[in-house]
């Protein structure tokens, strides 16, 4: 272990430390939020306001710090970084606001914010690498992630069905644009986790939840179809962008992690709180492969352009 650390440059060590710290921060936030919701009378809106305010303050702090530190960064990249940071906060805010705090299933879905927070973190810390391709992939991710929440809210009006279909259409229309990228877009790695979450989650909901009516199950089928579209898009991009083994390792890791985590989410959460540690272990592994990917792309100086 010491030999491995000695081989790393100061910049690489800082990257690993930041990844570990942010992983701990993300899951402490999730665990504390869940604990407060279950064991206190503090309103959900109060927690939402505090956590949302902290996130937006962090984003503005990072943006202005980077603007003052890296004078060589183009204004267009700073502007795009600001857009991504702001849109990620707004998406986070509205998603959290749409969750019913009395529903166990919906509270569990808060833990799915982890990949979203990873992307949020990396777009704020590497603004010089932001490109149109990353912005488009970020929008696709927001569609993929938010689709888990909104159908349950609008299934009586049919809006959930329309939302799913629009998301599927959006993915197909984005294929041609994304295929023009010359470098590897690491943000698309997070789509793997979103796919397996939605797909296996849909299977569990359809087969085990008796309270979900036929309309709800139909919408979950659309969610699963949407996840499959995302996955096939990822396979297509792998061939075009020539992804390396680390990406396949991350995808495999996501499968194993979610196969273990899903049963805990839906059946054991109320009685057993220790599954969060299992999530944390897999998170460290995900961060390792994710950071190695970022380091390789930066080393080859592709900058996703």
Question: Where on the chain are the PLM-derived regions?
Answer:
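Glycine-/small-residue-enriched transmembrane alpha-helix faces in small-molecule transporters
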Residues: 1-46, 86, 94, 153-180, ...
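Helix-helix packing/entry segments at the starts of transmembrane helices
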Residues: 107-113, 178-196, 231-266
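Hydrophobic/aromatic residues within transmembrane alpha-helices
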Residues: 36, 47, 98-99, 124-126, ...
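Hydrophobic transmembrane alpha-helices of multi-pass small-molecule transport proteins
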Residues: 3, 132-150, 260, 275-295
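Hydrophobic alpha-helical transmembrane segments of multi-pass integral membrane proteins
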Residues: 13-21, 44-63, 140, 183-229, ...
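Cytoplasmic-side transmembrane-helix entry/capping segments in multi-pass membrane proteins
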Residues: 16-19, 75-83, 130-141, 160-161, ...
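Specific alpha-helical transmembrane segments that line the substrate/conduction pathway
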Residues: 46-49, 53, 96-127, 167, ...
